[in-house]
């Protein structure tokens, strides 16, 4: 699958060494699946202290920690393996954020439930229709609409759809810093970037005067507002 990453580590030292990068992936909306090999089920149940573990044995400690830096986390057992793998992978694909799966040594050899797990990937058609109509009405009634693209267009692998939307609507477009290169910079309705601290009167004028700002995939952080301008830095 294009645009996704994966890493495999051992429990404890391995996963903790990688945890900083996983947290960074969450902050930057990067889809990475962290697969961690942990000791066998009996070792976990008996709280046997083996290498790479804390002396007060808790094989779930790192799993609990990863819940705070991933979109979904699972610790597999015989009873939950199929359901949890499907749940975590669904979140992985849908949200494009890092996820975590701890896999005990003996899980692969266990017989697990073959009960079918189904997830509904279909949008609520009525809600989708109502929202689409409201958005279309807002855009069609606008006198000075502007499209502003950003990071999540890239993260959700939607550049083609974004470019088609810009070209079909013929609405002037700009972007935040992380949305650079979403469309060709020589496109006739491209206003240039709208970045904090970098003066671009054309983009600033359009954004400040618009009556309909169409923000596509925005990530609002202090970087958008707080950088000093070249004039101030000088």
Identify the residue ranges that each predicted region occupies:
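N-terminal alpha/beta PP-like core and its mobile active-site loop of ThDP/TPP-dependent enzymes
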Residues: 1-227, 231
């Amino acid at each position: 699958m294009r645009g996704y990453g994966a890493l495999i580590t051992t429990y404890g030292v391995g996963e903790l060494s990688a945890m900083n990068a996983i947290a960074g992936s969450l902050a930057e909306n990067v889809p990475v699946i962290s697969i961690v090999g942990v000791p066998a089920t009996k070792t976990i149940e008996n709280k046997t202290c083996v290498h790479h573990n804390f002396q007060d044995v808790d094989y779930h400690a790192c799993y609990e920690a990863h819940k705070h830096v991933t979109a979904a986390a699972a610790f597999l057992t015989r009873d939950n393996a199929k359901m949890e793998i499907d749940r975590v992978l669904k979140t992985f694909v849908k949200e494009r954020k890092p996820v975590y799966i701890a896999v005990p040594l003996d899980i692969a050899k266990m017989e697990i439930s073959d009960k079918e797990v189904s997830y509904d990937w279909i949008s609520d058609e009525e809600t989708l229709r109502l929202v689409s109509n409201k958005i279309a009405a807002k855009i069609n009634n606008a006198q000075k609409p502007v499209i502003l693209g950003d990071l999540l267009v890239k993260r959700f692998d939607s550049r083609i759809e974004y470019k088609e939307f810009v070209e079909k609507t013929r609405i002037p477009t700009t972007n935040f810093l992380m949305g650079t290169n979403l469309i060709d910079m020589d496109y006739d309705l491209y206003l240039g970037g709208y970045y904090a601290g970098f003066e671009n009167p054309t983009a600033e004028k359009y954004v400040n005067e618009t009556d309909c700002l169409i923000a596509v995939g925005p990530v609002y952080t202090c970087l958008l507002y707080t950088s000093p301008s070249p004039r101030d830095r000088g």
